[in-house]
A protein has these predicted regions:
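N-terminal alpha/beta PP-like core and its mobile active-site loop of ThDP/TPP-dependent enzymes
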Residues: 1-333, 367, 371-374, 429, ...
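Active-site diphosphate/adenylate-binding microenvironment
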Residues: 6-10, 14-19, 27, 32-37, ...
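Active-site nucleophile and cofactor-binding loops and adjacent substrate-binding regions
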Residues: 24-26, 45-56, 71-78, 133-134, ...
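Charged, low-complexity, helix-prone segments enriched in Lys/Glu/Asp/Gln
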Residues: 61, 80, 334-354, 420, ...
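Well-ordered beta-strand positions enriched in small/hydrophobic/aromatic, beta-favoring residues
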Residues: 69-71, 159, 378, 401, ...
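Thiamine diphosphate
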Residues: 99, 108-114, 306-308, 314-316, ...
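Phosphate/pyrophosphate-binding active-site segments
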Residues: 136, 174, 196, 292-384, ...
Length: 554
């Protein structure tokens, strides 16, 4: 059948199972938006306040579901406003397809109104990108974009569509989506060798990251820990993969991880890294990281093997397939002395002391968990509040904690929470933690939450400073607080009212308990401002370049 480019655009989106699209209209994409208007019963379009918010929403949608997030923006500034969101998804291996409009093909490279070479700009931060110069290529290019985003190590793909392509006509043939290409092969001899090393270990430790978030990978990982009684430490991106309360879960590892997990890394004799890339927030000193251990690394991306830390055995493959193949070779073995040592270290873990005279982050987060129960989805911005949330939330779901890890994007949270809420439905409880610094970055997305009546509860830790940077200035810069005391006078309650949502101001735990209970009853979005001390710190902390011997506990 004969269709124009805009009709093909919608048909392929539906063909790929897209039910929700985040975006912002403009001149170069008017034809696409006209077709979306005609197909509003097939695809829900979410209009955000800013294209960056749309990109974070597509990201949050993908993280919450595992499906591909989709974002659409116009040419020029619309396209460049997506860059931070695309880079955020790229660093955390999130499947996303970003569609951008552009000037007509004959005008490409001539510096026309709102032209930007978005293909070149995004080349380092996408798995692949395309510029579609003929309408005949549009359908298959879109299909390729979705396939690439989900294949192997997941990530964002960009498709740039000149305006004339959206109006041109060609023959269109519908196709069924191709199966996602999964890496099912691996070196069986290496897996046997890995099993032998693990079976011979006296102090084994699993260190796992965001690469095991998929349901297929989570279960074999849990089975391995249980069968061989192996303690496990996780990265920020893997919170919830092994539930809170599992006896083998010894906590988050890295710069703001717990003492036990960091001590275990230093003292283990075999380290099994699964879906983790040894980032500089975990392997702060690559030369001393797990220096006493034989290191086995399992990763779907061959380029990550041995990239940051030298490893003894590198296995390329999908964690689910590798672990399932390894499990029958693993002996049912106990490590009583090692587990006893772990328990002794756990007695030394940092636990903040509550102070009834002021509101403290761990109390707030604990109360949120108490009132929400285990099924809530938690989203964060970036800063001290992000680390507090990672430390104190009782994580139980593999996709229940959504945060920007690799890029560390302040302003990520509200858009991501909107995406998660749209993906999971209004009956799913979504709570977003932010700080006054991060929240100022993209709080304009409040109008989106209000417009779509999304019951997102936003908890704002307001210490009236840029807390994480200030903490570093306290520790390493002689308390020279350069530009981290902004002296802002934002009244978040009045600002909330201006957006059309309910705001609360809390200075003690009783006020917060009452405010959060009330927010849970409301159908729309709410903000709860929590006043905390500007000198509140994220602890423990290992300075950059340090190791367990440099850990700061007070």
């Amino acid at each position: 059948m004969q269709l124009n480019g805009s009709q093909i655009f919608v048909e392929v989106l539906c063909e790929q199972g897209v039910d929700t699209l985040f975006g912002y209209p403009g001149g170069a994409v008017l034809n696409l938006y006209d077709e979306l208007y005609k197909n509003a019963d097939r695809i829900t379009h979410v209009l955000t306040a800013h294209e960056q918010g749309a990109s974070h929403a597509a990201d949050g949608y993908a993280r919450a579901t595992g499906r591909t997030g989709v974002v659409l923006a116009t040419s020029g500034p619309g396209a460049t406003n997506l860059v931070t969101g695309i880079a955020t998804a790229y660093m955390d291996s999130v499947p996303m397809v970003a569609f951008t409009g552009n000037v007509a093909t004959e005008g490409l490279g001539k510096d026309g109104f709102q032209e930007a070479y978005i293909e070149g700009i995004t080349m380092p931060i996408t798995k692949h990108n395309f510029t579609v110069r003929r309408v005949e290529d549009l359908a298959d290019t879109m299909r390729a974009a979705f396939r690439i985003a989900q294949s192997g190590r997941k990530g964002p793909v960009l498709v740039d569509i000149p305006k004339d392509v959206t109006a041109a006509v060609c023959e269109f043939t519908p196709k069924k989506p191709e199966p996602i290409r999964t890496v099912t092969t691996f070196n069986e001899e290496q897996v046997k060798w890995a099993a032998e090393i693990i079976n011979g270990a006296q102090r084994p430790l699993v260190y796992f990251g965001g690469g095991v978030r998929s349901a297929a990978s989570c279960q074999p990982l849990r089975d391995l820990l249980k069968k061989a009684e192996i303690p496990a430490a996780y990265t920020l991106m893997a919170a919830g993969v092994v539930p809170y309360g599992d006896p083998m879960n010894i906590g988050m590892v890295g710069m703001h991880g717990c003492y036990t997990s960091n001590r275990a890394v230093a003292d283990c004799d075999v380290l099994i890294a699964v879906g983790a890339r040894f980032s500089d927030r975990v392997a702060l000193n690559p030369k001393t990281f797990a220096k006493n251990a034989t290191i086995i690394q399992i990763d779907i991306d061959a380029s990550e093997l041995g990239k940051n830390v030298d490893v003894d055995l590198a296995i390329v493959g999908d964690a689910a397939y590798v672990l399932n193949a390894m499990l029958p070779m693993i002996e049912d073995k106990k490590h009583p002395d090692w587990i006893k040592m772990i328990h002794e270290w756990q007695a030394q873990d940092y636990h903040p002391v509550s102070d009834a005279s002021r509101l403290m982050p761990h109390q707030v987060i604990g109360e949120v968990c108490n009132q929400c129960g285990p099924e809530a989805v938690y989203v964060t911005d970036v800063g001290q509040h992000q680390m507090w949330a990672a430390q104190y939330i009782r994580h139980t779901k593999s996709r229940g904690f959504i945060t920007s890890g690799g890029l560390g994007t302040m302003g990520f949270g509200y858009g991501a929470a909107i995406g998660a809420q749209m993906a999971l439905g209004r009956d799913q409880r979504v709570v977003m933690f932010t700080g006054d610094g991060s929240f100022h970055m993209n709080l304009n997305e409040a109008c989106t939450a209000v417009s779509y009546e999304l019951p997102i509860i936003t908890v704002i830790f307001n210490n009236q400073v840029l807390g994480m940077v200030r903490q570093w200035q306290t520790a390493f810069y002689g308390k020279r607080f350069s530009q981290t005391d902004p002296h802002r006078k934002t009244n978040f309650v009045k600002l909330a009212e201006g957006f059309g949502l309910k705001g609360y101001h809390c200075e003690n735990l009783a006020q917060f308990q009452e405010a959060f209970a009330d927010a849970l009853k409301r159908k729309g979005p709410t903000w709860i401002e929590c006043m905390i001390d500007k000198d509140e710190k994220v602890l423990p902390m290992i300075p950059g370049g340090g190791d367990i011997n440099d850990i700061i506990m007070k």
